[in-house]
Structure formats: structure tokens, C-alpha cells
Amino acid sequence: MLDFMEYIQLGFAEATNWNRDNSYSSLTATAQSLLDFKTPERLRVHLSSLSTPHFATSYTLGTVGLIDGSVSYLYSTVPFDHTPSRSALIPLRKLAPGYRQVQPPVAPIENWGWDSTLNHETTPLAQKATLLHATMHMPPPTTLNALFLRRISPTMQLTLAVCSTRGPPLSKSAPQASLLTQLSHDTGKYSNEYLFSTDNALFGWRGLWNFGPDPRNPADDAAPRLSLLSAGAEAYYSPVSSLVGMSTGLRFSTLPAATDASSAPSSSSSPSSATPTQISTFPYTLTLTLTPMTGSLSTTYSLRASPNLSFSSRFGFNVYSWESEMVAGCELWRQSRKRVPAEEEDDGLEWARRKLRMMDDAAVPLPPTSSVPAEPEQDETTESVLKIRVDQSWNVRLLWEGRVKELLVSAGVGLGPSSFSSSAWTNSTAGGAGGQASGGGNAGTSYWRGVGVSVSYSS
């Protein structure tokens, strides 16, 4: 489940019309949400608040062997007036990412209201969208994470991320720190990301290309696109450590028009299309990624069988070590509706009417029940999701996320043998699903990986 600050950053991207799907880093986002989800560690409590439309705070307290926690602050020049902040009102599907429906590429909005350079306004609301976020993790060694995000233009975004860790108490050296700079350029048809990290002076580039018509030059009579094929690649180089890395990938996904039969053209004046074509299919996403340097090949297939049920699978193979990885997972959403009687309007005299009915019950006849119109009952809908993930070594993860009263609760458990045979595979594959696979103890002695509960409340 996303924490409150990640949810606010998601609202910032939506408010500034930034497409998160049009990036190479989001190529396998659907499979990662269904297969690489994390379970809570022990007990953790989150208290958050959107104090003003521009300022948010969050506090975290957890027990992982010892008491730890964090304090977070966020400021944005873009007001979050239309972003629900109460934990009872936040849509659960935004906090619990699952199957991610890829949207068709769109051209950047040229008359972007948050760019003072484009509309030549000097009011505070017309300033370029900027977000500042800082998190302090405690206890020692204290770690500070800071984020600076700024929309330079409708097609460009600048991100600065800083991570600083305080040294040992007796050490007189300066705290270790690293800076990651990322410049993103998105035109709808393609996107480029340029990265630089002070850690080993690492340079990087990521790019994604969408096949098909250019959204910047739309045709008036063009039919809605039913699918999207994207190709991308990334490359990294460090002159200090002589580190070289690269990967490439493909993604094929259905678009919302393919899952709605009514959106398909049903008739036309041309004779060739006299027969109605009702096109409707299940939303699905296919990806293929290749890392030539490590010889890793990975394919994923994700399917939304119904609005409340999704499946995903991943198969990986390493041509150098001949090791393979197979992971399968699913998510099941459950909606429960409780009949709640509508609240009657209270004018403050109901207590007096009850007294009169008690005193004159026999003298004053009550009106027939049929003459009094019944108040319609209201439906109170609550959602919850159950995620299950299993790999070829029978390591199982179960995660339940839902809303209890006004609290957001996430409970998970990890099961599996203590030995994990595919640890070498996960170390050689970028973004593998074995991040939590390592466990202690002898093989076969324990099947418990961990259990935890996370409780969140926001206002």
C-alpha cells in the first residue's frame, strides 16, 4: 500500500498532467504491482495530515526489533483542493496498486496553467509547479531523504533526490550523501530521461517509443486505438568504477477502447464496414525485457479477468547460468455493501415527542404505518483486496489491504522454505521479485518468513 506522501505525489502528477505510464521505468509496472508487492514488517503506525492545500505532514512509528520511525514534510505550489486526504475517503484502488491500465499517449497541454512562462502571469498560482519533500528516518544512524521536483515546461520535468546518512557517533567525518538528478522529457510519442548520480559519477539514459500515430498530430476521423506497442531501452556508465549496464524491452497492452464494445465503430457509410464490429476483450499486458550484460531474459503476462480479479505471471531465464525463475500471482477485490438506514432529520424536539408518546400512548392513536413514507436505505460500500504471490521455490506471500472504520489496514504474511535456490537469479536480474526471499535458519526448519500489520490514518 502506498504511504500518504506517495499518494500526495501521485496527486501532484495528476494535477500537472504528467503521464507516468510513458516512461521506460514503468514498462513492467503492472507485473511488479501484482508480483513484487511487499508485506508489512511487524507493527507499523502511520499518522498523516494535509494541513493546508499546499502542505502535508506524516509521522511513522514502527517496531522492527527496536523502536524506529520517521517524520515527513511536503510542500507543493499546486493546491490539492480536489485530492481526498481523509483515510475514510481516499479511494483504496489508488493506495493499493494492482493491474495498471495503460492509457493511450496524449500530447502535452500547451496552455498549461501552472507555467508562468507560457501564460505570462505573475500570480502565485501561475508559478511553475514545484514540490518539496523531506523525510527523516530515526533512530541513529539517522538518514535524510529529500526530493525536489519542478515542472520546467509542459514536456519537461526536473527531479533532484538527495540521500544523506549520518556516520557513527564518534566519527568526525562529514555525513555520507549522494545526489541523483533526473531530467525527463515527454512528448507523448516518445520520452527520454537523463540521469546523473554523484555515487560513482554514474550517467544514465532511459527512452521509450510508442508505435502508431503521433498524438501531437491527431486525425479528425481517426478511430480510437485498441492497443499500444512500446519499445524502450536504458544505458548506464560510470567512468569512476568502469561500470556499464544496459537493458531493452517491449510492451504490448490493450487500451480502454478495446475493452468497451460500445466504443468500437458499429456502422459506417462505406460498404466494406456495413457489418457492425463489436470488439471487446479482457485487458491484458505483455512485456519482454532483455539485459545483455547479465544474460537475463524475462517475460510477463498480466490479465484482468474481471473488474475485481487480475492474474499475472513472470518467467525469467539466464543464458549464462541456465537458472530460471517462475512467479505467479493474483489479486482479488471484494466489495461488501451494508444496508444502512437513512438518518432522519432531527430538529431537536425528538426527545419531547418520545415523552408525549409514552404519556399518551393509549389516548393518542398513532398514524398507520402505511401512510408514513419509509425513508430509503443507503448502501455503504467497503472495499478490500487480497493479493497472493508464489514462486517456483514455494515461497508464498499473502497481503490483505482494506479499510476498517476510518483506518487503512494492511496485513501480510510470508511463508516458504528457509533456503532459496534462485537467489543467484534474483541478484543477476534487475528489478527481480526475490528482494524478500532471503531468510535465516536451516533448509526445511521453518516456513515462516515474517508477519506484520500496518495501520494508517490521515486527515
Swiss-Prot record:
It holds the Pfam family MDM10. Coiled coil: none annotated. It is found in: Mitochondrion outer membrane. InterPro entries: Mdm10 (IPR027539). Its main location: mitochondrion. Disulfide bonds: none annotated. GO terms for cellular component: ERMES complex; SAM complex. Keywords: Membrane, Mitochondrion, Mitochondrion outer membrane, Transmembrane, Transmembrane beta strand. It comes from the Eukaryota. GO terms for biological process: establishment of mitochondrion localization; mitochondrial genome maintenance; mitochondrial outer membrane translocase complex assembly; mitochondrion-endoplasmic reticulum membrane tethering; phospholipid transport; protein insertion into mitochondrial outer membrane. It is a multi-pass membrane protein. Component of the ERMES/MDM complex, which serves as a molecular tether to connect the endoplasmic reticulum and mitochondria. Components of this complex are involved in the control of mitochondrial shape and protein biogenesis and may function in phospholipid exchange. mdm10 is involved in the late assembly steps of the general translocase of the mitochondrial outer membrane (TOM complex). Functions in the tom40-specific route of the assembly of outer membrane beta-barrel proteins, including the association of tom40 with the receptor tom22 and small TOM proteins. Component of the ER-mitochondria encounter structure (ERMES) or MDM complex, composed of mmm1, mdm10, mdm12 and mdm34. Associates with the mitochondrial outer membrane sorting assembly machinery SAM(core) complex. Belongs to the MDM10 family. Lacks alpha-helical transmembrane segments, suggesting that it resides in the membrane via beta-sheet conformations similar to those predicted for other outer membrane proteins and porin. This is Mitochondrial distribution and morphology protein 10. It comes from Aspergillus terreus (strain NIH 2624 / FGSC A1156).
